[in-house]
């Protein structure tokens, strides 16, 4: 995979940063976006000797900012070949009747609206060139319920369905759409979910060998390296230590 222009959201850490490192080569150009500037700057410095990097501090929840960032790209970066819609997060594990509504708003605005905005403003160029690939990062949480997953799971179910509907919209073009549904992966995800509580975050992975950010990046590499007539629609992957669980069951104590 070389000679491509790749736009990655949520590139400051986790899956996004791993994808940036994977795509970095002399012939690729990377557009890296994230809200957090310092880690984005460090990543740009790390990769600058390997490829051309355009760094954009960006909150994908801001529609006008997304539009301005994409339409304001330097000419040599405007023909985006691959969009990795990675920006997303989970906040809290409270049941629906006790949840902080601000957390719900943040998840909906980031996981759904942010992905929509980036797709909407990148896609016309792909359609005009009759070439491109959109990679949407969903989650097994969008397919399999668990207590406390309420809105987070709902947002990821949206990502999966939106990806499938995009495929229908783009039928007849050479623009591909793929959706990846990772299971448990050890990144900053749980630390963000538990709002900085590192002990709670570490407990999620205790005694397991979870997926890594690099596993997801390698999955992205495989998807985009398929022949142009092959579209990987939806790909679910889990650690060997994870499987589908039964429905939660409440049992009265005798």
Where do the language-model regions lie?
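The beta1-alpha1 cofactor-binding region of Rossmann-like NAD(H)/NADP(H)-dependent oxidoreductases
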Residues: 57-68, 101
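Conserved glycine-rich Rossmann-like NAD(P)H-binding loop of the short-chain dehydrogenase/reductase
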Residues: 26-42
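Substrate-binding pocket helix/loop in short-chain dehydrogenase/reductase
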Residues: 94-96, 100-108
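Residue(s) in the substrate-gating loop at a strand-loop-helix junction
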Residues: 139
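C-terminal helical subdomain
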Residues: 179-183, 199-246
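Active-site helix of classical SDR
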Residues: 119, 155
């Amino acid at each position: 995979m070389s000679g491509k222009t790749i736009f990655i959201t949520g590139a400051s850490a986790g899956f996004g940063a791993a994808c940036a490192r994977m795509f970095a080569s002399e012939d690729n150009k990377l557009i890296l976006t994230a809200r957090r500037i310092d880690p984005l700057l460090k990543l740009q410095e790390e990769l600058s000797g390997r490829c051309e990097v355009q760094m954009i501090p960006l909150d994908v929840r801001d529609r006008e900012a997304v539009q301005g960032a994409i339409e304001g790209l330097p000419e040599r970066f405007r023909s985006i070949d691959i969009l990795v819609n990675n920006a997303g997060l989970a906040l809290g594990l409270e049941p629906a009747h006790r949840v902080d509504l601000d957390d719900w708003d943040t998840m909906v605005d980031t996981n759904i609206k942010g992905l929509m905005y980036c797709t909407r403003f990148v896609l016309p160029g792909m359609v005009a060139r009759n070439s491109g690939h959109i990679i949407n990062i969903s989650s097994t949480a969008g397919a399999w319920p668990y207590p406390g997953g309420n809105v987070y799971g709902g947002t990821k179910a949206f990502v999966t369905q939106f990806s499938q509907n995009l495929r229908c919209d783009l039928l007849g073009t050479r623009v591909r759409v793929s959706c990846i549904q990772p299971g448990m992966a050890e990144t900053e995800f749980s630390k963000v979910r538990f709002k900085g509580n590192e002990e709670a975050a570490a407990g999620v992975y205790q005694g397991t060998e979870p997926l890594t950010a690099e596993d997801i990046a390698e999955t992205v590499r495989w998807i985009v390296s398929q022949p142009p007539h092959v579209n990987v629609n939806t790909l679910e992957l889990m650690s060997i230590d994870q499987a589908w669980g039964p429905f939660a069951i409440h049992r009265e104590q005798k």
